[in-house]
Amino acid sequence: MMVDSRLLVSDRINGTTNKMNGALDHSDQPDPDAIKMFVGQIPRSWSEKELKDLFEPYGAVYQINVLRDRSQNPPQSKGCCFVTFYTRKAALEAQNALHNIKTLPGMHHPIQMKPADSEKSNAVEDRKLFIGMVSKKCNENDIRVMFSPFGQIEECRILRGPDGLSRGCAFVTFSTRAMAQNAIKAMHQSQTMEGCSSPIVVKFADTQKDKEQRRLQQQLAQQMQQLNTATWGNLTGLGALTPQYLALLQQATSSSNLGAFSGIQQMAGMNALQLQNLATLAAAAAAAQTSATTTNANPLSTTTSALGALTSPVAASTANSSAGAAMNSLTSLGTLQGLAGATVGLNNINALAGTVNIAQMLSGMAALNGGLGATGLTNGTAGTMDALTQAYSGIQQYAAAALPTLYSQSLLQQQSAAGSQKEGPEGANLFIYHLPQEFGDQDILQMFMPFGNVISAKVFIDKQTNLSKCFGFVSYDNPVSAQAAIQAMNGFQIGMKRLKVQLKRSKNDSKPY
């Protein structure tokens, strides 16, 4: 109530409080240091006019923006708004008088008023400059003299080593961000100081968010490097496996019914990871042999032959007799190119439907994804089938690790997927939870590209705050790649977060018919 009485006094003295806060002197634009304020706990029935009447006692209002729910017709207020005063002083006075103090009619809680996220209350990090390529002969006073023409300097510090000597860089904090921006425009690369090899560098100092984002990106890069290294190590270490295991695996993949999987129980002593490696070896051996024996052939035919080898008993027999030779030949560039060709073929699997019995292959994989419950299979056999599912998607991971040049070309082809919301076929669309807030479309694209051809990658952004909602969608052009991504990335830890990756629910799931 003291605030209200003070305002009444100022009205009598000055005619209006607006005059006290510079409203009569303002220009068409707010002051450079003006603050955009977020205001919550306002009645949903209030319009901009009523809000203006609430705020104008503290100073002239430049802009009021009521947040509305556009999904309703007509759009309804969300009970909050943004307000920008012409002067910084007016905004702070309004905050001091209203925040957690005044409760508006019909509301149960007092007004919440604070600088918008974009303003950060004129935080130091928004006004702090990094000065690089500074002469080591300069001290703090020299830096102050150099930058004082641009405004009031709150702090000036030269970075020094343990010996007390200058490291050739400094930090300068101005009173306002506008002053700092003017200093950057005028001083950046404007001169080369004594003892320096390059012109002076003047830019905003890294914020804590910048540092955290850089740390997360480095951590993700290291983890993906380890993943690729481990994956390629698994492939190259399979040469010692016997042809008998390969024959059994080929027989399993060449069958269109689940009865053929009974023979896999002979491998009961092997864990799921070893079985997955077996599947990958079979695919790699078939692709390698096809590459070695086919010359001047159409790439589509080559890939068709490689895929046919995965389902053909004849190819299985050939792979059994020459598995060791195929693995040794993987070290040659020609063979690796054949492996990459097989990968491209998998990405265009629909184009081969008329040549290879793809339906037979995919029907078995579809059974792996949920139709096995009624067959009475043991956990070990189910794990084996799960490993076989990855055989067709695993090749791409190994090709990426072994062929960084070819893989980078694939990367360029998929760049357009970042930010788009194009959906793939049924079972090829993923929902990713618990993404770091710093992650954007490009980050999620790079993270999920090793598992297949990504046709879209999108991180969802809050339209009001312009910040990530920490979830997104990734779509592949085939369900096999999506399954491989789920198995590799579900539970993958980035910083303090552990990703949750699952299939996007079908639109038909909610329909009762």
UniProtKB/Swiss-Prot annotation:
Residue ranges constituting the RRM domain according to the UniProt record: 35-118, 127-207, 428-506
Signal peptide: none
Cell wall biogenesis/degradation listed as a keyword: no
Matches recorded under Pfam families: RRM_1
GO MF annotations, alphabetized: RNA binding
Localisation per UniProt entry: Nucleus; Cytoplasm
Biological process per Gene Ontology, one example term: mRNA processing
Alphabetical UniProt keywords: Cytoplasm, mRNA processing, Nucleus, Repeat, Repressor, RNA-binding
Listed GO CC annotations: cytoplasm; nucleus; ribonucleoprotein complex
Cross-referenced PANTHER family: RNA BINDING PROTEIN (PTHR24012)
Function text: RNA-binding protein implicated in the regulation of several post-transcriptional events. May be involved in pre-mRNA alternative splicing, mRNA translation repression and stability.
Family: Belongs to the CELF/BRUNOL family.
Designated name of the protein: CUGBP Elav-like family member 2
Record organism: Xenopus tropicalis
Species lineage: Eukaryota, Metazoa, Chordata, Craniata, Vertebrata
Gene: celf2
